[in-house]
């Protein structure tokens, strides 16, 4: 049924393809006339198209001419002419779809035409890639096309300072990773001044490897966190003791597969008895549930000397794939502290969420979203339901000739790898290039040792050094090449039979000291000859490898996602080349062991010898079933993350919208008057909720009012004015006190000046919003941590989260209003008045207006925490954390890396 829904949701039907084909025909009809343009005339086409758009013409109508201009510019600068299917893919992107294009169809070039067309609006286009290396490489290469047409391109890289980032965002087209774009959005919404903002809106995004970014990585939200306030360490120690008294299956359940725990009724009673509390589910006790869950996870799911080690009294995480210690990394959401408490070492400060957003909600902010991938069909339903994105299957430029062989299944892993090595050796001996895909670094290194023992030269790629690995992958199609790679390694780089001419030419020019940005004219002059020489160099070898059967792709294990299996296969058979693929499996592979142990066990007990491969429908069905289970679980996880973030997203949009308007200079006078009215009304309502004037405690009410503002009218004055307590009404009381508060506010404004008062209002409200929002995020984190247990009380956790989250948000907004009013009345303020200053310079004298300067305790920009943690999905979708100042790596010059096999720090990018 799911596949039927997926087919129905795919928009790549005859009608859509006919529309795209018509666009391609229109562009082709213009090609000969565009070829007659001089370089200057082609550049002027950009100005003409921009003016026509400003005069009201729609981008859809400008598409044929814009795409024709890009095709011609690309031919002249890169020596690459867009195929018709690449133009169709570009049109699909412009229309806000996902273009499903097979590996090797030139997706990087596809993005140039829609990026150029949409950049004509002046609003900026974002092109999102999976890592820094690809962002920089594509920006450098495709930036040559944009510059030729008079546009600028930028690139966002980790560790760039805000001034550089702002410059890159100001470009017409900006490249970068999903994490960098997302973190910039969050940092902009933590800014204290308009000058700190770097982004300029979310208009049009093209997401490369869209299934990886919008599906695989969407399970992990982006989080910026800093040291938490208050003492929570006591609770970690307390709960570490509590859980030693609890027994698995009796007091709690553990699911190792999902890495989750659930507390049973008996366990809850023991915890309540130990802590001396009546009900763990009461809202006041909500934070305790998170401590309990983490303590059980630390006890059952995190094993010493496997998941972590203790060195010098410190808990250090061990990489599950490499066995290496990950210095500086800490588990988030209190997990690291729970392990420290369990081990009895010093508990280091917990981090508090300062800003967070899911990738789903970040990308849904774009006015228009599009994407490219070779494998979107299996997720078409999710793309439509989450992002309202249709999937358009673009035909290949040439017919596919790859042969996909049936899987070979062995009883155990050792025998499987023996067969793998034998197959590689046979192919290598005759010179056929081989690409071997593994699911982990550990398996890559194991296979590497086996190959070395047999004397087979090979390269191992583990997605650690993107620049160096792209250089190796680019040459993985050469005769006799053997390349072992994890699924994530070397993405975005074409494996061309005989070698990658484009990559060779880039490396050649870099070796001569030429840079496409720094030496633009020399570079463009040298490119045609370098590219032609590189093409000639690989031509003969290309023919030889074709004769040998093309690239052979060998998978050593099925991945938990069908898409990633298909991506690996797709590395072979590009652009109509011959190719072959096969998967070698064992019944002890993780996928079979965890998700279809029954089928695996039946086959294990069969009489087939260990070293004989099994080929059976039962195996195929077991694999399909296991992959279906994992995909279903992951989809449910993403859906769950999104449901909960949708609750927070509505609140985030409201708060971030207010912050942005304040930063941009909104006049808050009316809003502050509403704050004043609302706060005083709430105080009076609370004091007069029962009885009549004779029953009300006027002394207490006046005490409360004095904490808010310097009241100038006494309770006796108001009572006398009303004609006694018995005759006073709530409305009269509100009218009198509000009138007094407004007079006091006016007097304060006269004392410091209207302009200064407006600035004070902005600074106070911004400061209070910032502090209260962080407190709110902290409370929402704790609410979410314990909300799952509401299911035991027969309540829907999501509904409970929505309900309590709304109540907490209302309470936060009330606190923002009350604190803002209190500060505005009571802050001691020093004001340097506004003044007009005459300035003399070379052009003569002119007058500059200097805004009033306000100084008050607590109103300066808050001090930035010494360390900020950035948590985001890695390329495998798993959560990874880096501490600011120690980046997870920054890409280097790709061609230089190709030349010397090492990545160097990238220079600061310039707007171009």
From Swiss-Prot:
Uppermost EC category: translocase
| Signal peptide positions (record) | none
Disulfide bridges in this chain: none
The membrane-topology field of this record reads: Peripheral membrane protein
Coiled-coil segments:
none
A GO term (biological process) for this protein?
intracellular protein transmembrane transport
GO MF, one example = ATP binding
In residue numbers, the region (Disordered) covers 860-912
What the entry lists under SUPFAM superfamilies is as follows: Helical scaffold and wing domains of SecA, P-loop containing nucleoside triphosphate hydrolases, Pre-protein crosslinking domain of SecA
Assigned EC number: 7.4.2.8
**Which amino acids does the record list as binding ATP?**
86, 104-108, 494
Question: Catalytic activity, per the record?
Answer: ATP + H2O + cellular proteinSide 1 = ADP + phosphate + cellular proteinSide 2
Q: Which PANTHER family match?
A: CHLOROPLAST PROTEIN-TRANSPORTING ATPASE, SECA INNER MEMBRANE COMPONENT OF SEC PROTEIN SECRETION SYSTEM
Q: How does it assemble?
A: Monomer and homodimer. Part of the essential Sec protein translocation apparatus which comprises SecA, SecYEG and auxiliary proteins SecDF. Other proteins may also be involved.
Identify the NCBIfam families for this entry. Answer: PRK12904.1, secA
The molecule here is called Protein translocase subunit SecA
Organism, per UniProt?
Arthrobacter sp. (strain FB24)
Task: Supply the source organism's classification.
Answer: Bacteria, Bacillati, Actinomycetota, Actinomycetes, Micrococcales
* Gene name for this UniProt entry: secA
């Amino acid at each position: 049924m799911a596949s039927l829904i997926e087919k129905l949701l795919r928009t790549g039907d005859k009608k859509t393809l006919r529309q795209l084909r018509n666009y391609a025909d229109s562009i082709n009809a213009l090609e000969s006339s565009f070829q007659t343009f001089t370089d200057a005339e082609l550049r002027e086409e950009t100005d003409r198209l921009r003016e026509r758009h400003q005069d009201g013409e729609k981008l859809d109508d400008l598409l044929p001419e814009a795409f024709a201009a890009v095709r011609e510019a690309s031919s002249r600068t890169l020596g690459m002419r867009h195929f018709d299917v690449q133009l169709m893919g570009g049109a699909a992107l412009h229309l806000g779809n996902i273009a499903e294009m097979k590996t090797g169809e030139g997706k990087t070039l596809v993005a140039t035409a829609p990026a150029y067309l949409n950049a004509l609006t002046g609003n900026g286009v974002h092109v999102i890639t999976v890592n820094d290396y690809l962002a920089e490489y594509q920006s450098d290469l495709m930036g040559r096309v944009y510059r030729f047409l008079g546009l600028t391109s930028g690139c966002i890289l980790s560790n760039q300072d805000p001034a550089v980032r702002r410059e890159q965002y100001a470009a017409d087209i900006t490249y970068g990773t999903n994490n960098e774009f997302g973190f910039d959005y969050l940092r902009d919404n933590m800014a204290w001044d308009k000058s700190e903002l770097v982004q300029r809106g979310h208009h049009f995004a093209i997401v490369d490897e869209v299934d990886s970014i919008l599906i695989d990585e969407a399970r992990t939200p982006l989080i910026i966190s800093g040291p938490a306030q208050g003492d929570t360490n006591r609770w970690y120690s307390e709960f570490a003791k509590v859980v030693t008294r609890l027994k698995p299956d009796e007091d709690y359940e553990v699911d190792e597969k999902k890495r989750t725990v659930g507390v049973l009724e008996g366990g809850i009673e023991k915890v309540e008895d130990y802590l001396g509390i009546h009900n763990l589910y009461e809202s006041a006790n909500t934070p305790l549930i998170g401590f309990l869950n983490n303590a059980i996870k630390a006890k059952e799911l995190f094993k010493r000397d496997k998941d972590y080690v203790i060195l010098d009294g410190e808990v250090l995480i061990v990489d599950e794939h490499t066995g290496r210690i990950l210095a500086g990394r800490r588990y988030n959401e209190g997990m690291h502290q729970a392990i420290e408490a369990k081990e009895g070492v010093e508990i280091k400060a917990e981090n508090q969420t300062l800003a967070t957003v899911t990738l789903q909600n970040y990308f849904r902010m774009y006015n228009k979203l599009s994407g490219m991938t070779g494998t979107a069909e299996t997720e078409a339903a999710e793309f439509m339901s989450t992002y309202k994105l249709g999937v358009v299957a673009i035909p290949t430029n040439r017919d596919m000739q790859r042969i996909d062989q049936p899987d070979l299944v062995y009883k155990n892993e050792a025998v499987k790898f023996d067969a793998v090595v034998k197959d590689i050796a046979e192919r290598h001996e005759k010179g056929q290039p081989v690409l071997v895909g593994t699911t982990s670094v550990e398996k890559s290194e194991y296979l590497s040792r086996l190959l070395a023992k047999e004397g087979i030269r090979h390269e191992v790629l583990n997605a650690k050094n993107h620049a160096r690995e792209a250089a190796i992958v680019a040459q993985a199609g050469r005769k006799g090449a053997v390349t072992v790679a994890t699924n994530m390694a070397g993405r975005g780089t074409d494996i061309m039979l005989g070698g990658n001419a484009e990559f060779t030419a880039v490396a050649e020019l870099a070796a001569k000291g030429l840079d496409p940005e720094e030496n633009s004219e020399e570079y463009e002059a040298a490119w045609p000859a370098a590219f032609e020489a590189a093409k000639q160099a690989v031509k003969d070898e290309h023919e030889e490898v074709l004769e040998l059967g093309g690239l052979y792709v060998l998978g050593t294990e099925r991945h938990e996602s069908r898409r990633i299996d298909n991506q690996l296969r797709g590395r072979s058979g590009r652009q109509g080349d011959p190719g072959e693929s096969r998967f070698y499996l064992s019944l002890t592979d993780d996928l079979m062991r965890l998700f279809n142990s029954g089928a695996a066990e039946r086959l294990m007990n069969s009489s087939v010898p260990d070293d004989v491969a099994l080929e059976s429908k039962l195996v195929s069905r077991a694999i399909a079933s296991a992959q279906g289970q994992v995909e279903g679980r992951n989809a449910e996880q993403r859906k769950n993350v999104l449901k909960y973030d949708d609750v927070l997203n509505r609140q985030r949009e409201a708060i971030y919208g207010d912050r942005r308007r304040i930063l941009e200079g909104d006049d808050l006078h009316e809003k502050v008057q509403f704050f004043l009215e609302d706060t005083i009304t709430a105080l009076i309502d609370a004091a007069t909720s029962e009885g009549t004037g004779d029953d009300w405690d006027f002394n207490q009410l006046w005490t409360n009012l004095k904490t808010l503002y310097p009241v100038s009218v006494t309770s006796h004055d108001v009572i006398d004015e009303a004609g006694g307590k018995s005759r006073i009404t709530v409305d009269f009381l509100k009218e009198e006190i509000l009138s007094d508060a407004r007079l006091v506010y006016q007097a304060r404004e006269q004392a410091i000046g209207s302009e200064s008062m407006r600035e004070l209002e902005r600074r106070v409200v911004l400061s209070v919003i910032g502090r209260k929002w962080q407190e709110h995020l902290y409370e929402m984190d704790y609410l979410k941590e314990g909300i799952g247990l509401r299911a035991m009380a027969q309540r829907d956790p999501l509904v409970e989260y929505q309900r309590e989250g709304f109540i907490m948000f209302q309470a936060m907004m009330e606190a923002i209003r009350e604190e803002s009013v209190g500060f505005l009345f009571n802050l001691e303020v020093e004001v340097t008045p506004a003044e007009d200053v005459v300035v003399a310079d070379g052009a003569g004298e002119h007058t500059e207006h200097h805004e009033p300067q306000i100084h008050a305790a607590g109103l300066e920009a808050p001090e930035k925490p010494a360390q900020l943690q950035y948590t985001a999905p890695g390329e495998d979708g798993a959560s990874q954390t880096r501490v600011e100042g120690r980046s997870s790596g920054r890409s280097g010059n790709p061609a230089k890396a190709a030349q010397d096999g090492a990545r160097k720090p990238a220079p600061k990018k310039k707007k171009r």
